[in-house]
């Protein structure tokens, strides 16, 4: 593996060099960044692949959407549409992407969710539709520098921190590690239970200043479907369906609950399910005494319209997740809110 990385290193240097030149051009003002009349909080990473952005974004929404008129803007990775799309109750993952759809299912009218490849155009459209909009959360926008933001929150996985990785293709980084200097706070995700919080010094060596570092974990909720919660029996058999970057933590959780996974349908991240996929799972279910089929909530929002189309509901479930906090979250939340308030005050002074 190390030998392969060494072979790929010249390509990584080329890729990283191109992104470094681009960042330098933004730093010097040669590429224009737009300041829009709204507070902007960016949640992102410098590593390709899942780092747990969605549950952390939900945490921010829980904290701030009730205080400030808020919208989430995402690129909508994996969607089949183009341009600006505002999420509605009729939206599908094909229209807005699976993660924005998952965020919208929790919105309950408190915040708006939209997708647009051009983040500047997306925010401008949101301001047209919601004139009293105060806060925009940019989902996965760390490299999208055309919009000036008030807070840059960098996420990194505990088991695979950015400072121990290489730039693509030798590693998974989208840019050199010094991209972390743009962060105003770092969130360490997927921290194992009872893990020592020893990575802070390594993280702060790569940031521009002493900034808040928050350690979080993934907490799994009760298995459920549209009819309510389901209680597993000891050693009950199940079929697991996953279309996420790393299903292993979910597998470990189900095993810890003494659930016997007899089959796993494993798809790539952001996979778009088809009726043929559902039929294949259904055939396996019917051939195995109606064994329960369980999946992530991210997969569920894509699968449930197909289940309705086939008039299926019983025996299909998902495991919801939320973020758990291992370290003091107040310093980070105070940092974010202070910058939001400062931005809104400046906007008020100029109106």
From Swiss-Prot:
Residues the entry annotates as binding ATP: 47-54
Pfam family, one: LpxK
Domain of life of the source: Bacteria
GO biological process, one term: lipid A biosynthetic process
Keyword entries, A-Z: ATP-binding, Kinase, Lipid A biosynthesis, Lipid biosynthesis, Lipid metabolism, Nucleotide-binding, Transferase
Cellular component aspect of the GO annotation: plasma membrane
Protein's pathway: Glycolipid biosynthesis; lipid IV(A) biosynthesis; lipid IV(A) from (3R)-3-hydroxytetradecanoyl-[acyl-carrier-protein] and UDP-N-acetyl-alpha-D-glucosamine: step 6/6
Reaction catalysis annotation: a lipid A disaccharide + ATP = a lipid IVA + ADP + H(+)
Principal EC category: transferase
SUPFAM superfamilies cross-referenced by the UniProt entry: P-loop containing nucleoside triphosphate hydrolases
Documented EC number(s): 2.7.1.130
Single GO MF annotation: ATP binding
Family per record: Belongs to the LpxK family.
Task of the protein: Transfers the gamma-phosphate of ATP to the 4'-position of a tetraacyldisaccharide 1-phosphate intermediate (termed DS-1-P) to form tetraacyldisaccharide 1,4'-bis-phosphate (lipid IVA).
Protein name per Swiss-Prot or TrEMBL: Tetraacyldisaccharide 4'-kinase
Native source species: Cytophaga hutchinsonii (strain ATCC 33406 / DSM 1761 / CIP 103989 / NBRC 15051 / NCIMB 9469 / D465)
Protein's gene: lpxK
